[in-house]
C-alpha cells in the first residue's frame, strides 16, 4: 500500500508560520543600480536570515510563496515560482560571471535565482525519455519497498518454530513493526528533504535499509528480528514518502497523471506479489532465511540502479545550490533563491511536521478520510493472513499455490491504473467549466471516482466471504480479489486529491496524519486476523469487514453533497477568499 502516495506527498508546504523573527539588518533601503544594499550581508547561508526583516519587497515575495503553495498536486505541496511576480530594476547591472544574467529585483534589492526559459538544469525540461526512465526506476524502488512488507508473510511457521515463539509474536516481529516504521518515518524525512534535498535522503536511508536486511536474515533471536525490521520499516519509508515529490519535480501538471498512476500502483502491487514470492521460497528454499537473502539481493540491485540513474530533482535545493555558486563566483551576496527566504527554527519544523498532523485529525474531512483509508489498508494486510486460513488450512494447499491466489488482486490494481487517466480526463473536463468562469474547481469533483469505486471493496469482500467454504471451488475467493484490488487502488488517489484540494497549504500535514494512522492500523490488523477467522469462521470474519467497508461508502457521498458546508466551519480548510487561516 502506498505511503508514498501520501506520504507524499507528504512534504511540508510553505505557510505563514515559516517566516517570522528574522533579525533586523535590513531597513527599507532604496535600490541603487550599481551599489549593493546588502553590503553587510556575508555569503554564508545562515546569514540569509538578515535579508528579510523589514524588507517589504521580500515580504511580498513571501506572500506570493504562500499563495503559490499547493499547486503541484496530491503528493507534494511546494511553492510555484511561476506564480511569483518579480520586478527587475530598469537600471540593473549584470555580472559577467553570471550566465543566466539575473537582474536586481526593484522591490527586494536581491538577484532572485529562479529557472529561466529553456533552462536545461530545470528537471521539468529534461527529455521525455529521461523522465520515463526516472519514473520507471522510482516506481520500481517503490515496488521493491512495498514487497518487503509482505514477502515475509509467505513463510510464518518456520521462523516461529526456530525462535520458539507464537504465531502472533512472529507476525509482530516481521510485519507489524515494519509497517509501524512506514508511519513514523514520513514525519521526519519529508521536512528533512526540504532542507537537504531528496537524493541525500534516498541514498542514506536506502543504504541503511539494505544493510539492516542482513541481521534480519542472520537473526539468532526474536529481539534482533524485531529491532532490525523496525529500522528497515523506518528507513524504507523515505522513498515511499518522497517519490511522489520527485515525480512532481520532473512532470508538468497535465503530463503527470499517467506517471502518478504508475507510481500509485507500485505500492499495491508490491504487497500483492510478496506472498507469491514468499510462498515459493517457503516451499522450495532450504530455510526461511532465504526470504531475507532474496529480498536483500533484489533491494541491493535496485538501490544501485537508483543511485546510478536518478539525480537530485528538488527545485528549491537545485536553485539554492545555483545561488550559492553564483555568490561564490561573482562575489555578489545578493544572489538568493526563494528557498533561502524561508527560514524556520527547529521548533517551527517540529511543530509543522510532528504536531500539526495530529491537530488536523480534528478536522472532519481529514478524520473520516483517514478512517476510510486506514480500513482499506488494514483489509489489504488482512488478506495476507486470511488467504492462508482459507486455502492452506481449509483446502490443504501449499504456500506457493496459495500465493498464486493473490494474482487477481494485482490484476484489479492494474485495471485501476489503466482507468486512472480516464478518471483524470473526466475531472479536467468538469473542472474546466469552473476555470472558464475564473473560479477554482470545488474539491468535491475529486470524489467522483471514489463514489464509483467504493462499492467494489464490499462486493469483493462479500464474494470472498461466502465462497470460502472448503467444499466450494477455489475460484470464488480467488477472483473476488479482482474487485477488491480495483477498489483499493481507485479509492486511494481521489482521497489524497480531495484532502489536498481541501487544505492546500496544510495538505502535507493532513496527509502525514492519514499516513500515520493508516500505518498503525495496518500494522495492528495482522495481529488479530487469524484469531478472528478461527473464532468467527471464514464467512462471518470477512463479512464483518465487508459491512464496515460498506458503511464507509457513505463517506465520499457525504462530502460530495456537504463538503463545502463542512469546510466553512474549518479553521484550516483552504478558501480563495481567506487563503489559509
From Swiss-Prot:
Entry annotated with the keyword Cell membrane: yes
Q: Name one GO biological process term.
A: hexose transmembrane transport
Record: glycosylation sites: 11, 125
On whether Transferase is a keyword of this UniProt record, the answer is no
Q: Where is the composition biased (Polar residues)?
A: 1-14
Q: Which Pfam families match?
A: MFS_1 (PF07690)
For bias type Basic and acidic residues, the affected ranges are 15-27
Among the GO molecular function terms of this UniProt record, one is:
transmembrane transporter activity
Name a single GO cellular component. plasma membrane
Topology in membrane = Multi-pass membrane protein
- Please name every pair of cysteines joined by a disulfide bond in this record: none
Q: Which residues form a coiled coil?
A: none
Which InterPro entries does this entry report, sorted A to Z? MFS, MFS_dom, MFS_trans_sf
Classification via PANTHER family: MAJOR FACILITATOR SUPERFAMILY, MULTIDRUG TRANSPORTER, PUTATIVE (AFU_ORTHOLOGUE AFUA_5G02700)-RELATED
The job of this chain, per UniProt, is described as:
MFS transporter involved in N-acetylglucosamine (GlcNAc) uptake. Confers resistance to cycloheximide, 4-nitroquinoline-N-oxide, and 1,10-phenanthroline, and contributes to virulence.
Q: What is this protein called?
A: Major facilitator superfamily multidrug transporter NAG4
Gene this protein is translated from: NAG4
Amino acid at each position: 500500500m502506498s505511503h508514498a502516495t501520501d506520504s507524499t506527498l507528504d512534504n511540508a508546504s510553505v505557510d505563514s508560520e515559516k517566516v517570522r523573527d528574522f533579525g533586523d539588518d535590513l531597513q527599507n533601503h532604496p535600490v541603487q543600480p550599481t551599489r549593493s544594499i546588502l553590503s553587510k550581508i556575508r555569503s554564508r547561508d545562515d546569514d540569509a536570515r538578515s535579508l528579510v526583516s523589514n524588507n517589504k519587497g521580500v515580504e511580498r515575495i513571501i506572500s506570493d510563496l504562500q499563495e503559490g503553495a499547493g499547486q503541484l498536486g496530491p503528493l507534494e505541496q511546494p511553492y510555484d515560482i511561476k506564480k511569483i511576480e518579480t520586478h527587475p530594476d530598469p537600471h540593473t547591472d549584470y555580472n559577467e560571471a553570471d550566465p543566466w544574467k539575473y537582474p536586481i529585483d526593484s522591490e527586494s534589492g536581491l538577484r532572485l535565482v529562479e529557472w529561466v526559459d529553456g533552462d536545461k538544469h530545470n528537471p521539468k525540461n529534461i527529455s521525455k525519455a529521461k523522465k520515463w526512465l526516472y519514473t520507471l526506476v522510482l516506481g520500481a524502488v517503490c515496488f521493491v519497498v512495498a514487497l518487503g512488507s509482505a514477502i515475509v508473510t509467505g513463510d510464518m511457521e518456520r521462523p516461529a518454530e526456530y525462535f520458539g515463539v507464537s504465531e502472533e509474536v512472529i507476525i509482530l516481529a516481521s510485519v507489524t513493526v515494519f509497517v509501524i516504521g512506514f508511519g513514523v518515518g514520513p514525519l521526519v524525512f519529508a521536512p528533512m528533504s526540504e532542507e537537504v534535498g531528496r537524493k541525500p535522503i534516498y541514498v542514506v536511508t536506502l543504504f541503511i535499509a539494505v544493510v539492516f536486511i542482513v541481521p534480519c536474515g542472520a537473526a539468532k533471536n526474536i529481539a534482533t528480528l524485531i529491532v532490525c525490521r523496525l529500522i528497515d520499516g523506518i528507513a524504507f519509508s523515505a522513498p515511499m514518502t518522497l517519490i511522489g515529490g520527485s515525480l512532481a519535480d520532473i512532470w508538468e501538471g497535465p503530463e503527470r497523471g499517467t506517471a502518478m498512476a504508475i507510481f500509485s500502483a507500485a505500492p499495491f502491487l508490491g504487497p500483492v506479489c510478496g506472498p507469491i514470492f514468499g510462498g515459493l521460497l517457503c516451499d522450495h528454499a532450504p530455510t526461511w532465511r532465504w526470504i531475507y537473502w532474496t529480498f536483500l539481493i533484489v533491494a541491493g540491485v535496485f538501490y544501485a540502479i537508483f543511485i546510478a540513474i536518478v539525480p537530485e530533482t528538488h527545485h528549491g535545493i537545485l536553485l539554492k545550490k545555483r545561488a550559492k555558486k553564483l555568490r561564490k563566483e561573482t562575489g555578489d551576496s545578493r544572489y538568493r533563491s526563494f528557498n533561502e527566504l524561508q527560514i524556520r527554527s527547529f521548533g517551527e519544523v517540529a511543530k509543522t511536521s510532528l504536531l500539526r498532523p495530529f491537530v488536523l485529525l480534528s478536522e472532519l474531512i481529514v478524520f473520516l478520510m483517514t478512517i476510510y483509508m486506514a480500513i482499506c489498508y488494514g483489509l489489504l494486510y488482512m488478506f495476507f493472513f486470511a488467504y492462508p486460513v482459507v486455502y492452506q488450512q481449509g483446502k490443504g494447499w501449499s504456500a506457493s499455490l496459495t500465493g498464486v491466489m493473490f494474482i487477481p488482486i494485482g490484476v484489479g490494481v492494474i485495471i485501476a491504473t489503466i482507468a486512472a487517466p480516464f478518471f483524470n480526463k473526466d475531472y479536467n473536463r468538469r473542472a474546466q467549466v469552473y476555470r472558464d468562469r475564473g473560479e477554482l474547481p470545488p474539491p468535491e469533483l475529486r470524489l467522483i471516482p471514489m463514489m464509483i469505486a467504493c462499492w467494489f471493496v464490499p462486493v469483493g469482500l462479500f464474494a470472498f466471504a461466502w465462497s470460502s467454504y472448503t467444499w466450494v471451488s477455489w475460484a470464488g475467493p480467488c477472483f473476488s480479489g479482482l474487485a477488491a484490488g480495483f477498489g483499493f487502488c481507485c479509492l486511494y488517489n481521489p482521497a489524497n486529491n480531495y484532502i489536498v484540494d481541501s487544505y492546500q497549504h496544510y495538505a502535507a500535514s493532513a496527509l502525514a496524519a492519514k499516513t500515520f494512522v493508516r500505518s498503525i492500523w495496518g500494522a495492528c490488523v495482522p495481529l488479530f486476523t487469524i484469531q478472528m477467522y478461527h473464532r468467527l469462521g471464514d464467512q462471518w470474519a470477512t463479512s464483518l469487514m465487508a459491512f464496515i467497508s460498506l458503511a464507509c461508502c457513505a463517506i465520499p457521498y457525504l462530502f460530495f453533497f456537504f463538503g463545502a458546508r463542512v469546510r466553512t466551519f474549518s479553521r484550516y480548510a483552504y478558501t480563495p477568499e481567506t487563503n489559509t487561516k
